[in-house]
Structures are given as structure tokens and as C-alpha cells.
Amino acid sequence: MAKGKDVRIRVILQCVSCVRKGANEESAGISRYSTQKNRHNTPGQLELRKFCRYCRKHTIHAEIKK
């Protein structure tokens, strides 16, 4: 039997620089990735360095609320 909530949850990561700029002028859009995180190991907000196809470079992607 499972106890309480699951340890692994699904999170969505969003590009921080695209959000600040309000999306690029040449291509409208915000880069998003979906992944999982372990609540016990990472209780805070998850931030990973991933490739943003709209900025065309590696940027920080932060966890957003659903």
C-alpha cells in the first residue's frame, strides 16, 4: 500500500530569459520541458540549464506552477 503522496512528481521547466523578454521578436514562443523530480531530494524549486530553441542557446529553465 502507498503511504501518502508519491515521492516523484511531474514538473514543467520554462526558460527564464524568454519570460523576461516577453518572447523573442523573430519567433514568438517560450521553451518548456517536462520532467520529474524527487520531492525528498529537491524540496525547493528546480532549475536546470537546458537548450532553448527560441533563444538558440543554453539558458536556465526554472520550475513553474501548474
Swiss-Prot record:
One of its GO terms (biological process) is translation. GO terms for cellular component: chloroplast; plastid; ribonucleoprotein complex; ribosome. The keyword Chloroplast applies. Its main location: plastid. One of its GO terms (molecular function) is structural constituent of ribosome. Keywords: Chloroplast, Plastid, Ribonucleoprotein, Ribosomal protein. The keyword Cytoplasm does not apply. It is found in: Plastid, Chloroplast. It comes from the Eukaryota. Coiled coil: none annotated. PROSITE patterns: RIBOSOMAL_L33. Signal peptide: none annotated. Belongs to the bacterial ribosomal protein bL33 family. This is Large ribosomal subunit protein bL33c. It comes from Oryza sativa subsp. japonica (Rice).
